[in-house]
């Protein structure tokens, strides 16, 4: 499963880069001296830096998080969050505008893990099955999530608990994402 996720994510990033660079060149983001990333391509100019998603040489380790939660994160989630660094990536899924969530650097991965833990503990308190958010939507109460048990990708309404299956797996979801300009 991990290899399928990494391959599908790499193909999505290649499409995103090809489409974006054909339109406007490399994406730029604000440069922060104390928030560096292996995604940064050049030296900053006028407070901005060009960037690209960056595949990690070694996957991130989720052992401590798994042990703390007494829950094993789905292998697709571990591959997704632990395989690449990136800025949030705007995209479309069947007309739904969303921003894919990935860590920018190691410190951001730690923050993402904390947010995922908080999300999982909230779901546990509400007696809902565990899911891991992978993308945001324009509505802050609606997330795109990975079901930790089945690996399905859902549209999840946090306020009502309603869940709608978007794709049978993370690779299937990634293959159907449409790119948007950065």
Swiss-Prot record:
Function in brief = Interacts with the SecY protein in vivo. May bind preferentially to an uncomplexed state of SecY, thus functioning either as a chelating agent for excess SecY in the cell or as a regulatory factor that negatively controls the translocase function.
User: Belongs to which family?
Assistant: Belongs to the Syd family.
The gene from which this protein is expressed is syd
**Which CDD domains does the record associate with it?**
Syd
Q: Which organism is it from?
A: Aeromonas hydrophila subsp. hydrophila (strain ATCC 7966 / DSM 30187 / BCRC 13018 / CCUG 14551 / JCM 1027 / KCTC 2358 / NCIMB 9240 / NCTC 8049)
Indicate what this protein is called per its UniProt record.
Answer: Protein Syd
Q: Where is it localised?
A: Cell inner membrane
Q: Which cysteines are joined by disulfide bonds?
A: none
| Topology class, membrane | Peripheral membrane protein
State the GO CC annotations.
Answer: cytoplasmic side of plasma membrane
Any one Pfam family match given in the protein's UniProt record, by short name: Syd
The main location is membrane
UniProtKB keywords: Cell inner membrane, Cell membrane, Membrane
